[in-house]
Amino acid sequence: MTAINRILIVDDEDNVRRMLSTAFALQGFETHCANNGRTALHLFADIHPDVVLMDIRMPEMDGIKALKEMRSHETRTPVILMTAYAEVETAVEALRCGAFDYVIKPFDLDELNLIVQRALQLQSMKKEIRHLHQALSTSWQWGHILTNSPAMMDICKDTAKIALSQASVLISGESGTGKELIARAIHYNSRRAKGPFIKVNCAALPESLLESELFGHEKGAFTGAQTLRQGLFERANEGTLLLDEIGEMPLVLQAKLLRILQEREFERIGGHQTIKVDIRIIAATNRDLQAMVKEGTFREDLFYRLNVIHLILPPLRDRREDISLLANHFLQKFSSENQRDIIDIDPMAMSLLTAWSWPGNIRELSNVIERAVVMNSGPIIFSEDLPPQIRQPVCNAGEVKTAPVGERNLKEEIKRVEKRIIMEVLEQQEGNRTRTALMLGISRRALMYKLQEYGIDPADV
């Protein structure tokens, strides 16, 4: 059901109030009226209108004073002022005090309606943006970072403190370990959360384009610069700029970046005007910047400016306790996105996932699960749904056999080991199916499916 917009009409002339109230009521508005500024303030506090239409010249309290009083308590509701005096000074003062717009009497009702509709549309957009910011802030809370790893839990605790500061941050780690995720979490938990978060990959652009992308350029600064263009430093003002793959930034641009970190100012390419910015810089790299400093390929002074706080993210192979957690998260995500009813990953498949070294880290795990979801036709992901390099036959718990075998023998070997693992865990848990499913990292429903497939009776274990 569409919400009814509430309008507050304030005018000391009875005929104007009646005319406007009738006109907006016919358009579906809930109308409220006041004949002076003081009464309007009481109604404003009581009914919380979506828009206010108010005359400027009124006894007791004029529209400008009433507007100032409204703005001292609440700044979001659009206020449109009406005046019979076509005075530029009055209009300027009204806008300076926070009016959305003003109209001059006598006015055309259609024109006034357009102004009111524009005010409501803008208000709706602002409300949606606030909700999006709130949703982003909620989705990037520390509790939403999936981990059972003590090392990652410590990083999350440290990062929560870092977010409250204004210090530059350097995030190191292999590709796919979640450097951008941590950078976003810092931003959305900081005082800059309502500002922009912008990412640029320093390795993705050649030097000339990267400079233009970062610093912007004036019209005519170089061939093809037909218009003025703001750079990312300018667009990230009051927000956060993530410089990904900072180790790939050319030395000449490193010097310009150092100035921004020190002075918070720069000039566009081809420009002479110094532009001040208020931004937080987060740099990310999968390279050893200290080694690059020794080699002379990275500026030492820039390294120390960026390295105020250094976070080192562990690779996925060093946080194996997170693999099943992340795999199940990606399973739910991609099943929903692809409208598939895939409910679980079977124990043998999960064992293979846990044993794999994951050179591509979390990004590789995400891709593997997405592929399995897309290609699978049943309710459970099995070992044969995994890529060949992962689904190698298991000799015993934790060991992967590397000798090549035929596809037929591979499936038989996987099923044999899977059955043995289920029986061993069932025996350890004294036939308790709920605890067995928990230990195997699968749902009770998936365990029942496997018990039936292999003809295992928990009472016989």
UniProtKB/Swiss-Prot annotation:
Gene3D superfamilies: 1.10.8.60, 3.40.50.2300, Homeodomain-like (1.10.10.60), P-loop containing nucleotide triphosphate hydrolases (3.40.50.300). Residues 433-452 bind DNA. Disruption phenotype: Deletion of the atoSC locus renders cells not motile or responsive against any chemoattractant or repellent independently of the atoSC inducer's presence. This is Regulatory protein AtoC. Keywords: Activator, ATP-binding, Cytoplasm, DNA-binding, Nucleotide-binding, Phosphoprotein, Transcription, Transcription regulation, Two-component regulatory system. Phosphorylated by AtoS. Contains two phosphorylation sites, which are both involved in the transduction of the acetoacetate signal. Asp-55 is probably the primary phosphorylation site, but either both residues can be phosphorylated independently by AtoS or the phosphate group can be transferred between them. The N-terminus is blocked. ATP binds at residues 173-180, 236-245. One of its GO terms (biological process) is positive regulation of DNA-templated transcription. The keyword Ligase does not apply. GO terms for molecular function: ATP binding; ATP hydrolysis activity; cis-regulatory region sequence-specific DNA binding; DNA-binding transcription activator activity; DNA-binding transcription factor activity. GO terms for cellular component: cytoplasm; protein-DNA complex. Residues 145-374 form the Sigma-54 factor interaction domain. Residues 6-120 form the Response regulatory domain. Changing residue 73 to L: Decreases phosphorylation. Decrease in ability to respond to acetoacetate induction. 70% decrease in cPHB accumulation. Cannot respond to acetoacetate induction. The modification Phosphohistidine is found at residue 73. Member of the two-component regulatory system AtoS/AtoC. In the presence of acetoacetate, AtoS/AtoC stimulates the expression of the atoDAEB operon, leading to short chain fatty acid catabolism and activation of the poly-(R)-3-hydroxybutyrate (cPHB) biosynthetic pathway. Also induces the operon in response to spermidine. Involved in the regulation of motility and chemotaxis, via transcriptional induction of the flagellar regulon. AtoC acts by binding directly to the promoter region of the target genes. PANTHER family: PTS-DEPENDENT DIHYDROXYACETONE KINASE OPERON REGULATORY PROTEIN-RELATED, TRANSCRIPTIONAL REGULATORY PROTEIN. It comes from Escherichia coli (strain K12). InterPro entries: AAA+_ATPase, CheY-like_superfamily, Homeodomain-like_sf, HTH_Fis, P-loop_NTPase, Sig_transdc_resp-reg_receiver, Sigma_54_int, Sigma_54_int_dom_ATP-bd_1. It is found in: Cytoplasm. The keyword Transcription regulation applies. SMART domains: AAA, REC. The modification 4-aspartylphosphate is found at residue 55.
